[in-house]
């Protein structure tokens, strides 16, 4: 079974939900950059205040900041890990590849959770996070299409990419992912 996983997909695709389920079922480390950043905001640290301002505008947090957080967490002892929401652009992919090479834990599979935009907007509005309003959501989807979608082709070319139809019920999606992990 593969144990070094990455979840790609637009905001609201269910990356966090599926990653949390799999990490609990397999005792894997779940690295959600969104959750790590929100934790900084909740603690109201200097860094958290900067992150909050950036996220409220629907913009992405700097590559260097996110890489530091990810590197620190990947270095912990673990049975496996799931990256959720990182990397988001090709520059981050290159930085992540260096980190993974240094810790000798290569990425084994990338799941792309595919969901239509209208479903994403509805899901995001329903989850009720402070940073989820329609204008911010549309900005985030636009940024995603510009910066993150090229990663799909990158990982496809490395034969690491697995498409997941994530416009369905949680159990069906989870079963599809588990079958492809074997």
UniProtKB/Swiss-Prot annotation:
<dbReference type="GO" id="GO:0005737">
    <property type="term" value="C:cytoplasm"/>
</dbReference>
<feature type="region of interest" description="NMP">
    <location>
        <begin position="32"/>
        <end position="61"/>
    </location>
</feature>
<dbReference type="GO" id="GO:0005524">
    <property type="term" value="F:ATP binding"/>
</dbReference>
<feature type="binding site">
    <location>
        <begin position="12"/>
        <end position="17"/>
    </location>
    <ligand>
        <name>ATP</name>
    </ligand>
</feature>
<keyword id="KW-0067">ATP-binding</keyword>
<keyword id="KW-0963">Cytoplasm</keyword>
<dbReference type="GO" id="GO:0044209">
    <property type="term" value="P:AMP salvage"/>
</dbReference>
<comment type="function">
    <text>Catalyzes the reversible transfer of the terminal phosphate group between ATP and AMP. Plays an important role in cellular energy homeostasis and in adenine nucleotide metabolism.</text>
</comment>
<feature type="region of interest" description="LID">
    <location>
        <begin position="126"/>
        <end position="132"/>
    </location>
</feature>
<feature type="binding site">
    <location>
        <begin position="85"/>
        <end position="88"/>
    </location>
    <ligand>
        <name>AMP</name>
    </ligand>
</feature>
<feature type="binding site">
    <location>
        <position position="92"/>
    </location>
    <ligand>
        <name>AMP</name>
    </ligand>
</feature>
<feature type="binding site">
    <location>
        <position position="38"/>
    </location>
    <ligand>
        <name>AMP</name>
    </ligand>
</feature>
<feature type="binding site">
    <location>
        <position position="33"/>
    </location>
    <ligand>
        <name>AMP</name>
    </ligand>
</feature>
<feature type="binding site">
    <location>
        <position position="127"/>
    </location>
    <ligand>
        <name>ATP</name>
    </ligand>
</feature>
<comment type="subunit">
    <text>Monomer.</text>
</comment>
<protein>
    <recommendedName>
        <fullName>Adenylate kinase</fullName>
        <ecNumber>2.7.4.3</ecNumber>
    </recommendedName>
</protein>
<keyword id="KW-0545">Nucleotide biosynthesis</keyword>
<dbReference type="GO" id="GO:0004017">
    <property type="term" value="F:adenylate kinase activity"/>
</dbReference>
<dbReference type="Pfam" id="PF00406">
    <property type="entry name" value="ADK"/>
</dbReference>
<keyword id="KW-0418">Kinase</keyword>
<dbReference type="InterPro" id="IPR027417">
    <property type="entry name" value="P-loop_NTPase"/>
</dbReference>
<dbReference type="InterPro" id="IPR000850">
    <property type="entry name" value="Adenylat/UMP-CMP_kin"/>
</dbReference>
<comment type="pathway">
    <text>Purine metabolism; AMP biosynthesis via salvage pathway; AMP from ADP: step 1/1.</text>
</comment>
<keyword id="KW-0808">Transferase</keyword>
<feature type="binding site">
    <location>
        <position position="140"/>
    </location>
    <ligand>
        <name>AMP</name>
    </ligand>
</feature>
<feature type="binding site">
    <location>
        <position position="129"/>
    </location>
    <ligand>
        <name>AMP</name>
    </ligand>
</feature>
<feature type="binding site">
    <location>
        <begin position="59"/>
        <end position="61"/>
    </location>
    <ligand>
        <name>AMP</name>
    </ligand>
</feature>
<dbReference type="InterPro" id="IPR033690">
    <property type="entry name" value="Adenylat_kinase_CS"/>
</dbReference>
<keyword id="KW-0547">Nucleotide-binding</keyword>
<feature type="binding site">
    <location>
        <position position="168"/>
    </location>
    <ligand>
        <name>ATP</name>
    </ligand>
</feature>
<comment type="similarity">
    <text>Belongs to the adenylate kinase family.</text>
</comment>
């Amino acid at each position: 079974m593969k144990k070094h996983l990455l979840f790609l997909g637009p905001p609201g695709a269910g990356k966090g939900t599926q990653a949390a389920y799999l990490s609990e079922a397999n005792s894997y480390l779940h690295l959600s950059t969104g959750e790590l950043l929100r934790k900084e905001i909740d603690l109201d640290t200097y860094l958290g205040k900067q992150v909050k301002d950036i996220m409220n505008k629907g913009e992405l947090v700097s590559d260097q900041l996110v890489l530091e957080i990810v590197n620190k967490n990947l270095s912990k002892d673990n049975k496996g890990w799931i990256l959720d929401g990182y990397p988001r652009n090709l520059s981050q992919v290159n930085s992540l590849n260096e980190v993974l090479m240094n810790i000798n834990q290569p990425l084994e599979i990338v799941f792309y959770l595919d969901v239509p935009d209208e479903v994403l907007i509805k899901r995001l509005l329903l989850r009720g996070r402070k940073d989820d309003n329609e204008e911010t959501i549309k900005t985030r989807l636009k940024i995603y299409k510009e910066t993150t979608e090229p990663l799909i082709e990158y990982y496809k070319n490395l034969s690491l990419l697995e498409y997941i139809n994530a416009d369905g019920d949680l159990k069906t999606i989870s079963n599809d992912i588990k079958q492809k992990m074997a």
